[in-house]
């Protein structure tokens, strides 16, 4: 059975790295003749953490930290075998988590 669609989900803490990665994936897929939809920016997940500053008492003094997880979605319609091969050979940065589903 031939693959009719590839869905790629990207997650990263740095929005510049994820945008650069999405751009390279889209350029590679378009260069090989596939139809590309995206990158679609998905909602950013914000995790907030509150920590007591001092090691002893002073519970009134606290610090707040926030961790943003940026997400992008790319759909590749009618990928050719050349598209799949070029996506496998693509060199991607280490700070990006990639999920690939082929249907």
Swiss-Prot record:
Keywords: Ribonucleoprotein, Ribosomal protein. The keyword Ribosomal protein applies. InterPro entries: Ribosomal_uS10, Ribosomal_uS10_CS, Ribosomal_uS10_dom, Ribosomal_uS10_dom_sf. It comes from the Bacteria. One of its GO terms (biological process) is translation. One of its GO terms (molecular function) is structural constituent of ribosome. GO terms for cellular component: ribonucleoprotein complex; ribosome. HAMAP family: Ribosomal_uS10 (MF_00508). Involved in the binding of tRNA to the ribosomes. Belongs to the universal ribosomal protein uS10 family. This is Small ribosomal subunit protein uS10. The gene is rpsJ.
């Amino acid at each position: 059975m031939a693959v009719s669609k590839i869905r790629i989900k990207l997650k990263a803490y740095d929005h510049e790295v994820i945008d650069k990665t999405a751009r390279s994936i889209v350029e590679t897929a378009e260069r090989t003749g596939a139809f590309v939809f995206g990158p679609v920016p998905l909602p950013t997940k914000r995790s907030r953490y509150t920590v007591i500053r001092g090691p002893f008492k002073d519970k009134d003094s606290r610090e707040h930290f926030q961790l943003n997880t940026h997400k992008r979605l790319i759909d590749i319609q009618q990928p050719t075998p050349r598209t799949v091969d070029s996506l496998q050979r693509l060199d991607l940065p280490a700070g990006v988590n990639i999920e690939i589903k082929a249907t």
